[in-house]
């Protein structure tokens, strides 16, 4: 099968990008020298499973969150466990509403977030089995940790009670905490999961280039071992540090598929 090599880059802000180099069949495909930049699809449009889910989540959080933002896990005390997945999602939505209201009262910017509800399976729910629903979130909010924790509650005034525990940590992008947290959030493959994100989040910028590499050049790099060297790819992407390399052979298209991740200092232009 005749193929050309396409490079697709997803850039998230100034400090992170993912690059795929892949064989594309020539027949029936419009080939351009360099495609114009466009934005990646929203979370709703992504197939939220496995590799696709993890990759887009990493792209999105790196485009919108950074040092000083919060990584949250919210759990339930036994007496407040939701009876259904839908109830758990409503409680998380109520928590976000309380965050917005608290920020507005304090004259602070509205919070930016990506949150997800996890727990149980449809089969377990139908059987009436216990489900340990919980929530994960990426959060940019000017409230302090104590104020955020106190909003994970039910009731008002003297009847106000905490729903469960709130685990908070500060994001450290240079240490890979955003990527690690994304992996942790989608670690369980068989539980139910629902995503929400705040309006106005920046989308990763996608760039397509069909002329940067030839099939022969990629095959030579794999054969000589250069394709597995971070320094080889860093020369092609000045100013970026290659943090992961994955090379696979596509039997159907008879070509190599290269997947790269790059990082650089956030204050780099």
Spans of features found by a protein language model:
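Right-hand nucleic-acid polymerase module
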Residues: 1-131, 141-269
């Amino acid at each position: 099968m005749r193929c050309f090599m396409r490079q697709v880059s997803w850039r998230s802000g100034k400090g992170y990008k993912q690059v795929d180099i892949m064989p594309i069949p020539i027949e029936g495909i419009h080939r351009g020298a360099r495609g114009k930049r466009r934005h990646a699809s929203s979370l709703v449009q992504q197939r939220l499973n496995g590799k696709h889910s993890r990759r887009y989540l990493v792209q999105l959080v790196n485009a919108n969150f950074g040092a000083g933002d919060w990584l949250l896990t919210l759990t339930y005390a036994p007496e407040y466990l939701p009876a259904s997945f839908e109830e758990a999602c409503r409680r998380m939505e109520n928590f976000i509403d309380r965050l917005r209201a608290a920020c507005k009262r304090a004259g602070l910017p509205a919070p930016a977030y990506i949150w997800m509800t996890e727990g149980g399976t449809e089969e377990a729910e139908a059987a009436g089995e216990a489900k340990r629903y919980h929530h994960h979130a990426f959060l940019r909010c000017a409230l302090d940790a104590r104020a955020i924790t106190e909003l994970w509650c039910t009731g008002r005034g003297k009847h106000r009670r905490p729903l469960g525990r709130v685990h908070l940590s500060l994001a450290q992008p240079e240490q890979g905490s955003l990527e690690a947290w994304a992996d942790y959030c989608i670690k369980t493959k068989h539980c139910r999961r629902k995503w929400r994100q705040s309006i106005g989040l920046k989308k990763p910028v996608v760039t397509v280039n069909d002329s940067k590499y030839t099939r022969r050049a990629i095959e030579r790099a794999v054969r000589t071992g250069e394709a597995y060297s971070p320094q080889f790819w860093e020369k092609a992407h000045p100013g970026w540090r290659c943090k992961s390399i994955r090379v696979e052979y596509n039997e159907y298209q008879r070509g190599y598929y290269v997947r790269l991740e790059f990082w650089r200092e956030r204050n780099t232009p």
